[in-house]
């Protein structure tokens, strides 16, 4: 469809975005032969743009400053857990004016989430997923150190990069409901979303290293071929009849979102090894 594949490194969380971690991503893509257009875009380089949008929302009354202390936040969280509620922040500063005690102290900026009605995620894989707005708390878009959160940065960058289609794990569905509210608050066009099931271990539990969930560099160093890895990942949760072996051209031509299953797939290392043997022999 003549689309572009842009690589964005989401490095706003500086503690988790080391040079080595980023390099593993870049080298892994190169080894797999997954080529992106243009140069990588580092999210942190757009931090001033993210702050600009946070302040725009603040000035328009769609966000607010929050001076809640760690003790207050912990107390709210405990109350929420006791009441079995998803709302960990009770909107303490939503309509509260600061006093001299707060002025000059660090604060976060929270998005003023809608409290009435519902937010619907029109998803290409999951169908329409409905969220009651009273279950979405006022979430932080700018931390007390002035750094933007993923929730805001991803929306701003997707808009500025003219991203039309977002395909990601279904663990992001809750985030998407929040991000749709940001899109609407800014009167920006909402991209098409597709939330695909996560890969689980062979026992059905959350994937971990004991299941073989290791970095792509592990498989490269242990004799796996990139063709086998791509073929195996393609067939996890997606099918085209009974066909098991796909050339790269076939992968591109045949893949579609409508054949993705809603249920989670299980990582089967033995099947991956067998597929790898096929590619070694061919």
Model-derived regions: residue spans:
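Residues that form generic nucleotide/phosphate-binding pockets
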Residues: 53, 76-79, 92, 96, ...
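Short, compositionally biased low-complexity segments
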Residues: 27-30, 153, 263-269
């Amino acid at each position: 469809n003549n689309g572009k594949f842009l690589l964005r490194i989401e490095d706003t969380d500086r503690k988790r975005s080391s040079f080595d971690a980023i390099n593993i991503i870049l080298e892994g893509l190169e080894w797999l032969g997954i080529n992106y257009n243009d140069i990588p875009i580092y999210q942190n380089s757009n931090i001033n743009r993210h702050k600009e949008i946070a302040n725009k929302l603040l000035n328009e009354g769609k966000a607010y400053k929050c001076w809640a202390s760690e003790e207050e936040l912990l107390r709210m969280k405990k109350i929420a857990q006791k009441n079995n509620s998803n709302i960990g922040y009770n909107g303490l500063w939503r309509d509260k004016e600061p006093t001299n005690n707060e002025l000059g102290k660090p604060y976060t900026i929270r998005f003023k989430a809608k409290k009435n009605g519902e937010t619907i995620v029109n998803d290409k894989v999951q169908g329409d997923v409905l969220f009651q707005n009273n279950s979405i708390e006022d979430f932080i878009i700018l931390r007390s150190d002035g750094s933007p959160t993923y929730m805001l940065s991803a929306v701003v960058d997707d808009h500025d990069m003219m991203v039309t289609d977002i395909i990601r794990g279904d663990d992001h569905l809750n985030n998407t409901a929040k991000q749709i509210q940001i899109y609407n608050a800014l009167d920006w066009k909402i991209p098409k979303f597709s939330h695909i099931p996560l890969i689980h271990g062979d026992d059905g539990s959350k994937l971990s290293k004991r299941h073989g969930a290791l970095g792509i560099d592990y498989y490269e160093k242990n004799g796996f071929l990139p063709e086998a890895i791509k073929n195996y990942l393609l067939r996890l949760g997606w099918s085209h009849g009974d066909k098991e072996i796909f050339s790269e051209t076939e992968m591109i031509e045949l893949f579609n979102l409508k054949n993705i299953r809603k249920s989670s797939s299980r990582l089967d290392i033995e099947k991956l090894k067998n597929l790898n043997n096929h590619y070694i022999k061919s």
